[in-house]
A protein has these predicted regions:
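Glycine-rich loop(s) and the adjacent beta-strand/alpha-helix scaffold that form part
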Residues: 37, 41, 47-72, 281, ...
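Conserved redox-cofactor binding core of oxidoreductases
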Residues: 68-131, 136, 141-151, 156, ...
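N-terminal Rossmann-like FAD-binding beta1-loop-alpha1 element of flavoenzymes
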Residues: 19-44
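Residue-level detector of alpha-helix initiation sites
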Residues: 25-26, 332, 561
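FAD cofactor-binding and catalytic pocket of flavoenzymes
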Residues: 101-141, 169-173, 354-479, 487, ...
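A short, basic/flexible loop-to-alpha-helix module at the beginning of a structural domain
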Residues: 1-16
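A glycine-rich dinucleotide-binding beta-alpha-beta segment and adjacent secondary-structure elements
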Residues: 230-237, 246-255, 293-296, 445-456, ...
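A conserved FAD-binding loop/helix module that cradles the flavin
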Residues: 564-583
Length: 594
């Protein structure tokens, strides 16, 4: 494993960079990679600190080797799922704890990511209930993401033409497919080809192996025309010869018992996958602890002239200059930054002549699912499943050819079975001593479960705005949420639960429980759509190359620009779109068109 020396530099405030990139996650890291490969001088600004992820995650460490077995220290608290439903944000207000973190920290190994996610006391927000998971450190949430790497298809890009709701994307699968290929080859992805038109295959490396329970469910689903495929993980299983910072997956870590992350970097993360290689070009300047508070504007040309940022340690403000500005701060933070960037030229926020910034929010609903037992596997030899980066995925099957009368769009399932370090039945099994241990071992690998991820429709009335009164620790106005699931999501959730039960029963799996409750808005961490792309400047914020309709040298290259959520996880699409947009920007800058 090679880790680079600290190459982060102080920003040359007298210099005009070819591009300033705000945020270092999936979109920001990809922008840094692509633009530096074009020979451009790039400034990358990250609001959080640079962490040694190897020391933070410790996936090879036994729980008993860590203080409190990985649980939070006494002065810290992770919000529970129930707290999001019975309280209103800001959730840390009046809390007796010194530090308050999002729900992602609630569970085994919660102490392992406390330096990655934000302290809610420093970063409040207001409005409707919303489970907002934020990471402020180099690489952002890619340090702890769930690793499911899926493509979208024309079933998603042209969904509005199919069912009449919302807007089509201004691109087709043919436009983005070559860039999906580039992401696959550069970062690595494991999976199995299924030849599904609605879930295109990637250029896969070796797939995760299904265990006997999962094979049984796969064979049962095939009889009804449904598919269970090995988890399509953004993980290199065969290795990458072009990247010295990452090694191939050994299946040895604690992928299933941490909040996420991979300290050998087999799973993609932005620092080792994109930023460290970009630093080696000599074209990238990295500045951490830099919270961007405004996109600055040239009053004569109306173009973006750079950004102003706050040093998160000292509170001092600085201004950096750039020929172009790319926002990749995350869907909600990028919308916040656009709204914060008000001027006489852009009184409603930069790039917001349409009034759509912050609106058309969409994501994935979570909660409904099923949990069961394969009786024939009780007492059978256990499989090693704790180190798999994922187990299986059941792609969408609703509203593909026949239209459901109940709801629009569709959903998929993520699931898994097998033996882990913490068997599912360990807490609920009665008894003590050797007989108790034997029962836990005998049943530990026989359980199987899966949970749904459903498409949340983009609606103008689901939006965020700046709170006029509440500010964060650095005096920057925070977001106020106006986001609620609608009837379509509720009907979809009911079908999710019923369908999940049916699939398990048909496979001969004993159903132990069915979950019908929808988790709080935001729980999926797949927020999308607050600066959507489109061909009509009156109904969208950016064009097909994620370029502002109003300010041609301003781009938004994160999930903000997604027109709809589909039911597939968005990370791979964010990076493919960003690569495409950055190639276009580099060419336009060379031509003098930006």
């Amino acid at each position: 494993m090679f880790l680079p020396a600290d190459k982060s530099d102080e920003v040359d405030l007298a210099k005009t960079y070819d591009a300033i990139v705000v945020g270092s996650g999936a979109g920001g890291g990809m922008a840094a990679h692509v633009l530096t490969s074009h020979g451009m001088q790039v400034l990358l600004l990250e609001a959080g600190k640079k962490l040694n992820i190897n020391q933070e995650l410790k996936s090879m460490e036994w729980p008993y080797d860590h203080p409190r077995r990985g649980d939070m220290p006494p002065d810290s608290h992770a919000l529970s799922g129930r707290e999001y439903t019975i309280r209103q944000p800001p959730y840390a207000q009046a809390s007796p704890y010194k530090h308050v973190y999002s729900y992602i920290e609630d569970g085994n190994g919660s102490d392992y990511a406390k330096d990655i996610v934000v302290d809610e006391k420093d970063h409040p927000y207001t409005g409707t209930p919303y489970a907002w998971v934020r990471a402020r450190c180099l690489g952002g949430k890619t340090n702890i993401w769930g690793r499911l790497a899926l493509r979208l298809s024309d079933c998603d890009f042209k969904a509005a033409s199919r069912d009449g709701f919302g807007e089509d994307w201004p691109i087709s699968y043919a436009d983005i497919s070559p860039y999906y290929d580039k992401v696959d080859l550069y970062l690595g992805i494991s999976g199995h080809k299924e030849n599904l038109p609605y879930l295109p295959d990637s250029l896969f490396q070796r797939a995760v192996r299904l265990n006997p329970a999962e094979v049984k469910l796969r064979e049962s689903l095939a009889k009804t025309g449904r598919v269970l495929t090995p988890y399509r993980a953004g993980v290199t299983t065969d290795g990458l010869k072009h990247n010295k910072y990452r090694v191939h997956c050994y299946g040895r870590g604690a992928c299933d018992r941490r909040v996420g992350g991979c300290d050998i970097h087999a799973a993609f993360d932005s620092p080792t996958g994109l930023i460290y290689p970009a630093l080696e070009t000599g074209n990238l300047t990295l500045r951490t602890n830099a919270t961007v508070a405004e996109v600055t504007v040239d009053k004569d040309t109306g173009k973006a002239s750079g950004v102003s940022f706050i040093d998160t340690d000292t509170g001092k403000s600085y201004t950096a200059k750039g020929r172009s500005v790319l926002l990749a701060a995350s869907t909600l933070e990028s919308a916040r930054l656009l709204l914060l960037s008000k001027s006489s030229l852009y009184p409603n926020g930069i790039g917001n002549s349409s009034g759509h910034v912050g609106h058309n929010f969409c994501e994935h609903l979570m909660g409904p699912g099923v949990y069961g037992l394969n009786k024939e596997l009780v007492g059978k030899p256990r499989t090693l499943d704790d180190g798999r980066p994922g187990s299986f995925y059941v792609p969408r099957y609703r509203n593909l050819t026949d239209r459901s009368s109940k709801f629009l769009r569709g959903y998929g399932f993520e699931g898994g079975s097998g033996a882990g370090m913490f068997p599912d039945n360990a807490y609920s099994t009665p008894g003590f001593g050797s007989s108790y241990k034997k029962t836990v071992r005998d049943y530990g690998g026989a359980f199987i479960g899966m949970g749904g991820f459903g498409e949340v429709l983009p609606r103008y009335e689901n939006y965020v705005e700046l709170d006029p009164d509440v500010k964060d620790r650095w005096g920057v106005p925070v977001l106020r949420f106006h986001i609620k699931f609608g009837d379509n999501e509720k009907k979809m959730a009911a079908d999710m639960a019923d369908s999940a039960r049916e699939m398990f029963e048909d496979a001969g799996i004993q159903v132990l429980s069915v979950t019908r409750e929808i988790l709080t808005e935001g729980y999926s961490i797949h927020e999308l759509g607050t600066a959507r792309m489109g061909s009509d400047p009156k109904k969208s914020v950016v064009n097909q190359f994620q370029q502002s309709h109003d300010v041609k040298n301003l781009l938004v290259v994160d999930g903000s620009t997604h027109v709809s959520a589909s039911c597939q996880n968005p990370t791979w699409t964010i990076m493919a779109l960003c690569w495409r947009s950055c190639d276009h920007l580099a060419e336009e800058l060379k031509k003098g068109n930006v």
